[in-house]
Amino acid sequence: MMPPKPAAEDVADEQPEPPDEDPDVAEADPTGRYLRYREIIGSGSSKTVYKAFDAVDGIEVAWGKVEINERIMGSSKELQRLRTEIQLLKSLQHKHILKLYASWVDTNRRTVNIVTELFTSGNLREYRTKHKKVDMKAMRRWAKQILTGLEYLHSQKPPIIHRDLKCDNIFINGNHGKVKIGDFGLAMVMQQRKTRSIQGTIEFMAPELFGENYNELVDIYSFGMCMLEMVTCECPYSECKGFIQIYKKITEGVKPAALSKVKDAEVRGFIESCLASVSDRLPASELLKSPFLQSDDANHRSSNSVQEPVKFPENNFTKDEPIFVSLAPNNGTVNGKEQSFILVLQKSDFLLEGNMSTTNPVMLFLRFPGPDGKFKNVQFPFDMEKDTSLSVSTEMVEQLELPEWNNPVLAELIDAFLLHILPSWKPCVKVGKMLPSSS
């Protein structure tokens, strides 16, 4: 019979000395079960990860040491809260969350010690850098696993937000392609629905993190940046010089230059839905239903099934309102060819029209209510090979300074128009009921 497995204490003021017979061992945990080697396998601004060994199970593990700041060390209340959060993280059991074997607070050395399972293939950034040619099918599998892990974290009561999700903190087993979310050094249990402290890696931080409040949807934004890095092999905002320039772009809503390098409209649309404003951003449970992740063929499109587009939150003003469709005479020409009709779509006070032509780009005309209550008109080209409804509507909302809830309405009208002239078009948002116009 195996002896009972010892468990590390939550708090340890003194560390056992390393075994004399092994000079490579730097220290042991309070129970003596886990032995930390001197070999460093990862590091960050406040954390160092070492290779370690589980003497009971005979397996290699990872031992992370996270520095505790002065504010926590000087408060018994904060220390107790830290221990409570560590206990909760130890209780997490999910196939896409890195297993946490033991953890304890070392008050003398002012560190939190965390022992986890070891992934020998490293993190996703290292793996993607090593393997340049990765099919989108594999990246979709990674994305689904990451979102499944986030869905689990966010479904806890209260929800757990990671706050520092990035490719460095997602670990992969190269033998079977399994990925797990790890490095919970900044993870936080949401004692309230809103929180106010700012921590994380700036390139992956959602804009609302710089404001007063945020919730678990900041992890979805970070996931979108992870997807962007996976697809392009380029760190978001690598075009910027320094923290201030990145901060300015994020707070002004300017997306990374790498996004323009994503040529596949469906992939780009999925990433953009993750990077949408917080009021329009979908939770992990909804993103897992997206057509992009449901498709399994090499071109990530299925011709044998009809997928429901991602549902996008709408303003109550336009909720459930149908799109009225009509044809209007047009005596103009496109590329020298006569166009006898234009397609007109109207939803509430928004009107979109364009020629019944599949010539690329499609010229569209939009009539919409401006912030001052007066109707405004704008004409714009839509590149069916490069643009998505969401990328264009987001740009229009930003450039024209429209309310955020206009975004899904405009995207829906664009997708509805394109479905009429190109039935194979894959919409980014849910297209509601379309009815013939009486006028």
Swiss-Prot record:
One of its GO terms (cellular component) is cytoplasm. Belongs to the protein kinase superfamily. Ser/Thr protein kinase family. WNK subfamily. One of its GO terms (molecular function) is ATP binding. This is Probable serine/threonine-protein kinase WNK6. Residues 1-30 are annotated as: Disordered. InterPro entries: Kinase-like_dom_sf (IPR011009), Prot_kinase_dom (IPR000719), Ser/Thr_kinase_AS (IPR008271), WNK_Ser-Thr_kinase (IPR050588). It is an enzyme of class 2 (transferase). Its EC number is 2.7.11.1. CDD domains: STKc_WNK. Keywords: ATP-binding, Kinase, Nucleotide-binding, Serine/threonine-protein kinase, Transferase. Residues 10-27 have a biased composition (Acidic residues). It catalyses: L-seryl-[protein] + ATP = O-phospho-L-seryl-[protein] + ADP + H(+); L-threonyl-[protein] + ATP = O-phospho-L-threonyl-[protein] + ADP + H(+). SMART domains: S_TKc. PROSITE patterns: PROTEIN_KINASE_DOM, PROTEIN_KINASE_ST. ATP binds at T116, E117, L118, F119, K166. PANTHER family: SERINE/THREONINE-PROTEIN KINASE WNK WITH NO LYSINE -RELATED. It comes from the Eukaryota. GO terms for biological process: intracellular signal transduction. Residues 35-293 form the Protein kinase domain. The gene is WNK6. The active site is at D183.
